[in-house]
């Protein structure tokens, strides 16, 4: 399929912070020239040099994505190469700054196979369809999500929980490749003209809930007006707040449903039916990082007497 995009709009605001730890690509409120990919990163609050980490990852990943052939499908294997480049850029940045730096990640890209999305942490990715609402919303890699899933706290309690901003997956420099966190990967070919994709840091979602976002983004206003409304509501957030909004102008598909012939392992012809079904895959392959997040959750639960 061929996906044509409208003019993207974005914002990057300080909120009530003194320094800016968010970074976006492209780094413009209205980029005059843009690639078919978009990135938003949030330097982890409280860690040294978060602003360096977010910029290093966004720019390192963007440089690698510029070498991708978007006229074919973009696979998780392709993304691993891009992710490796981002980690390399982060490791290099850490040689001149603090090794304690870290950042969240959100990335979307449009290609022949549809739209691929990857994320780590509590920055989010949304896919909206104006007449249907939210088609996809990423699930935060956070302590509070683990507690909600475990039934320790309710969704309502999570909104004001003191640990709601503790994340358990992020990008941080390391000399050991096996210690690198991996993202959750989501891919869909269910894309129509008028669909809107939205990336943002938690400085936005801390002050605007999903229902309000849906009301604004699925309204009849222009994309620029939608961006302006979200920026206005996020302006006084306690945290840096950054977002990118991009809508689909046109989708030219080959065949939405088609079959292909191939040989199976026994040399027999088999027929596969290909449908535009969204696919979500967790690329976290390092159990030690998952276990460390689990141990952190247990420790905080003990401290808070949950």
List each model region and its residues:
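PP2C/PPM-type serine/threonine phosphatase catalytic domain
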Residues: 1-306
């Amino acid at each position: 399929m061929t996906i044509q995009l409208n003019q993207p709009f974005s914002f990057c605001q300080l909120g009530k912070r003194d320094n800016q730890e968010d970074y976006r690509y492209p780094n413009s409120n209205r980029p005059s020239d843009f690639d078919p990919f978009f990135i938003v990163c949030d330097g982890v609050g409280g860690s040294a040099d978060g602003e360096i980490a977010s910029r290093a990852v966004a720019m390192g990943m963007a440089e690698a994505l510029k070498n991708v052939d978007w006229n074919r499908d973009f696979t998780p294997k392709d993304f691993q190469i891009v992710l490796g480049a981002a980690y390399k850029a982060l490791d290099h940045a850490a040689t001149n700054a603090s090794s304690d730096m870290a950042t969240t990640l959100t990335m979307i890209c449009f290609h022949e196979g549809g739209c691929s999305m990857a994320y780590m942490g509590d920055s989010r990715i949304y896919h909206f369809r104006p007449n249907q609402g939210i088609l996809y919303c990423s699930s935060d890699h956070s302590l509070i999500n683990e507690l909600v899933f475990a039934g320790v706290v309710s969704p309502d309690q999570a909104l004001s929980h003191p640990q709601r901003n503790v994340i358990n997956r992020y990008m941080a420099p390391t000399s050991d490749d096996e210690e690198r966190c991996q993202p959750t990967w989501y891919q869909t070919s269910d894309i129509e003209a008028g669909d809107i994709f939205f990336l943002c840091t938690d400085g936005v979602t801390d002050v605007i809930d999903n229902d309000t976002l849906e009301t604004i983004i699925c309204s009849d206003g222009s994309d620029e007006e939608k961006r302006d409304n979200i920026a206005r509501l996020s302006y006084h957030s306690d945290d840096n707040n950054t977002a990118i909004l991009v809508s689909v102008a046109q989708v030219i598909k080959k065949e939405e449903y088609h079959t292909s012939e191939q040989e199976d392992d026994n040399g027999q012809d088999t027929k596969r039916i290909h449908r535009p079904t969204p696919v979500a895959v967790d690329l976290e392959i390092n159990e030690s990082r998952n276990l460390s997040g689990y141990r952190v959750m247990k420790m905080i639960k003990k401290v808070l007497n949950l």
